[in-house]
Structure formats: C-alpha cells, structure tokens
C-alpha cells in the first residue's frame, strides 16, 4: 500500500521555530527601515540566482529562508522606506503584516459561500469606505487588487448601463447602426493626464483605444471642460455614442484634481456616466482641512480608489463603489449550477449575505478585507486623516524649501501632495516656469535639453546611492523631479535632506 502524503510538515516544532524567527526578523526589518538605504540595486549575481529549473526534490526550510534573507529581502522596491517618494505607492503597516499572515494561515477565501465570516468583514469594510468618502450606504461595491481592476469594473458597468442595448447578450457588435451603417461606437472621455489603466480598461472591454477620448488639460493640469463639451458634441454629431466621463482626483504626474463639481454637472446635463478615478486623492476627503479639494467626488456614479496607496495598507487592496448597486449586479451576476445558492438556512449555499462574486469579474478572491479591518480598528479613522493631512502639509513644506533655494525651480503649484521641481543652478536656464521662451529660443532649447539630462541624472544618483527615491515626470515637455508625499514614515527633516542633496548633486554633476 502506498503511503499517502501531505504538504504539512512532519515536525510542526521546526515550523513553529522558523515562523517565530521570521516574525522577529520582519519586525526588526520594519523597525530599522530608517537605518537602511532607500533602495538597493540588485547586483548581477542576485539576478543570476533565479535562473535554473524547478526543484524536483525538497530543500531544508532553513536554507530556503536563508535565500530569502540574502537574495530577496534586501532588494525590494523600497516603498516602505521613509524617503521613498517616487510614486504614490504607500508604505505598509506592521498590523497589515500580521493580518496577511493570519489570512494566509486559514487559506482564506472571500466573497462566495454562506455563513463565512470573511464576507461579513469585507461588507463592513465596504460600508466604512462609503461612510468615509460620503457615498450612499445602499451603493454597490467590491474590494479589488487595485485601481486597475476597480476602473475596469466601473467602466464595464458604465458601458452596459449607458450603451442603449444589451451588451452582455449581444456584445459590441449588437450596437445599433451608426454613421456608414457600422455599429455605433461607444466613447469614454478623460483628461490627457489620466492614468494609463483607463486605456487598458477600454481595450479589455472591446471598445478600442480610439474610443478613449483624451481631453486636453488646462494650465493646472486639469481636464478642460470647454474642450470636453466640444469633443462630446462633435462625437455625437459624427454618429458616436458618448457613455462616460472620467474625472481624476489626483493625477499621477502632478496630483492635479479635475473640476469634479463641474464634471458632475456636465454629466448630469448630458446623461453620461460620471466615474472618478481617485486612486490616492480620494482619501483627501477624510482630512477635514483638505476635504474641499475633492468636493463633488461624492456625486460620481462610480468611484475607484486604492487602500494600499495613501491609506498605506499592505499590497494589494483597492476598491470600487457603484452608486447603482443593481447596475453593478446586472453587469457581472452569473450563477452556474455548481454555484447555485440562496435557498434555506443551512450549509454553505444557504440564504445569507450577497455573494461578491456577482459584482465583479473574479470568483477566486483572497481576504483583502482583513488588513483593512484590523488596521482601521487599530488606529481609528481620525489618525488616518491626520496622517493624510500631515503628508499634504509636508508637501507644502517642501514647496517652501524649493522656493527658498535659488538653484531649484518648481513646475507648478501643488494641488495635493505631489511636488515637481528641477535643478536649474543659480543662473537658471531653459524657459521660465510658465513656459515662456527666453530671448534666445535656440539657446533655451539647448538649456532645457541639458537640464532634462541633468535632472534625470540627479534622480538616478539619489536612487543608486540609497539617499532617497524620487522619480522624474515630464511636464510641458520638460523633466522634473517628482516627489509624491504619501508616506506615513516621512518627517520634515527628510525633505530638508532631499533638497540639500539635490542642490549638492546638481552642483557636482554640472561641474563634472
């Protein structure tokens, strides 16, 4: 008789010892982040370590763990470090680590089956999000892996709700005939500054990239409402069918916030679905001093946002809220016979809370909600609001440092928590911050090209030396250092150091 096998350890004591060590090492790592480089470039031998075939036989767990410590942990993105500001990524929290471990310990599934506590946790978290962001409690919603998924879900609901025909049953080929007899094309509108996930969403929804109308931005990098109105009118006159406008609460490049009340009014007047991509900026709504910045967001038909960005929860967890819960259900609900449920009061398929698999495209879903639930309980919403306001205040502090340094030039005033500036040297160079050309346009172009290259090199030196992690944004054709302040571990002295190092490196690189 063949012995039956399991993937459990033969010696639970050995596993317990490793688990205790792993927890101790993880806590030590988090507690010492400030002492570590902001980022470390993985050397060639680390990359080479991950070549080779899958192991046919077992390896001692201590050796596997040693590989993690030597080859993986030191070479992370660095977003948990206090001086990581290159992109809005969030930094994680210790409670999030514990929550992820607890969820994994039960191999937790969420969103399907009845009388499973995980579902109750997610539904409560969704209600908390609605409450915090001023959304009606009767709205639909779902936790996701992030705003890429959230935007996809929201645009799918918008497409189906506003298409004017049965998209689920007929597909886009079922659209009524437009100009020239071809099926009427559905169109979506967003700012030229809106996130690339919207492009992927319209592609995946079968609408095609050409159906996403990128509207010019104004001088403040917000969607131009007059241009939007003109594009919608022109498309209708050409036989197209506009269905949705996307407003952005915090653009990736500059943190700019579209005129959300204006967009809400426009969509109401034009019978268009109003979606807001609030990936990080939506959370300004919970900070009393800054809530006004995202006023109008609560009027959206759908709202996408992340909790792993400005709420600093462990990756991944995002959310989508849909004002018309039935429209979300109509877009995604599907119950095959092997998942029939909703009868009786006993067993895993009895009448209980709604199955969240009916309001999104995923059936297999992890327990994203636990880290949100535990972290909000640990700190309370008021502390999260204070941290968000702290970041906004730190961005204003950084703006002051930049203004006080004659070698630096800011691209445009920060609307939220992103500051974009560049090193120009004491003599300046290129064009003025408002884009006005200098007297010698050819010389200005040369200066701008040199400054672009110089600021890119400053970015790389800051990263490679482990000093700090900014990124580079292109604004009005010029490159600026991009500092996204969404880090609960950052302190004002970190920004003092950043400015000193930018000025120092700029001077060194200019001379060299």
Where are these regions (language model features)?
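N-terminal entrance/gating region of PLP-dependent enzymes' catalytic architecture
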Residues: 2-138, 463-468, 481, 486, ...
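Short beta-strand
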Residues: 409-414, 470-475
